Amino acid sequence: MDSAFSLSARHEQVLQATIRHYIATAEPVGSRALAQEYNLKVSPATVRNTMGLLEKHGLLYQPHTSSGRVPSDSGYRLYVNRLMSPSLQVGRRVDAALSEELDWMGRSLEALLKEATQILAQISGYLALVTVPQSNTVLIRHIQLVTVEGGQVLMVVLLDSLATQSVVVKLPSLTPSTPETAPEPGSRDLELLSNFLIHHLRGRPLADVATLNWDELDTEFQPFGALLCQALTNLAQRSQGAETPQFVVSGLAEVLRQPEFSDAQRIQAIVRLLEEDQAQLWPLFFATPPLANQMLNGLDIHGLAIKGVDVNVWIGTENPLEPMQGCALVVSNYTRRDTAVGSVGVLGPTRMVYENAVAVVKSAADYLSTALS
């Protein structure tokens, strides 16, 4: 494409109308229908010439020689970056639905995320995916030491993902005594130890136990530092060792209504990716698509974010995974204390209502960020 080419207002108007027609109908459109349907206030011949120029520069194409034109992946990319705005109405609907239907009291984060994906799938009409925070991003909320049988102590760690980790620790007597008369650890002693751990570890990941200065313990508790440190270290290692990227997914029935997913082989490949190869999806949820901020067929769209919205959109062949190359994936990170801990996404055809999809994802990410903080 000629690097000197730049879109005029008419080019943008015709491209936008073509894309909106195709999103609504899944059918190619000709110049006459486009001029009449969208009141472009120019003749069909002018529209035809403009569509031809857009095709020349890779933004439209003809699926068949006798048919009208449809948008290419590059056309969608330009539309997403320059010509559309997220739907405020849909965003408000998502926020209201999540606020009204999710009950955060006494439920695990995974259960809440599962319910959230069902809401997002229903509103968007696409497949909804949410990543579960991994242990290296999950912070300690509370620690409690409780006496159990045999003079042992149960250490319970509550994470701010609402998950719990626990380990049994064999502590020696907390007060001087002979082995025969050694009492079980006193509740007051365990409370003091719990408070020490909470003071130093609340708001930090499990992995930070290695940096804890046990010398700050009162002298009488010093013998227990190494045992407690080892117990916490074992918890952290156990959590990280069992960890795999995890997605909560909902809405397969929704996306199957789209004509692009009537191909059994295509949908089987996507389902296989979601069920068996989730680790391959992980980078797409935490990276920027290659064409989001660079030259597009010679047309400089650098810096044209989605009008200030912190959302990434992977369109068609921008997706590195072959089963996804006929799809669009819209994703946004949710945060805890300004650190990204997970991501929300919707997956559908490239012929996606991007205004709605971006609004759904961004509103959901904002809601989760606020709830977790």
Enumerate the language-model features and the residues they cover.
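N-terminal intrinsically disordered/low-complexity leader segments
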Residues: 1-6
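Residue-level marker of regulatory loop/turn positions in helix-turn-helix DNA-binding domains and
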Residues: 7, 27, 259
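Short, leucine-enriched amphipathic alpha-helices that occur as contiguous helical runs
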Residues: 7, 11-15
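Contiguous, well-ordered alpha-helical segments that form the cores/surfaces of helical PPI scaffolds
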Residues: 15-20, 329-331
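N-terminal helix-turn-helix
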Residues: 17-20, 28-84
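Cationic-aromatic interfacial patches
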Residues: 24
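Intrinsically disordered, acidic Ser/Thr/Pro-rich low-complexity regulatory segments
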Residues: 87-373
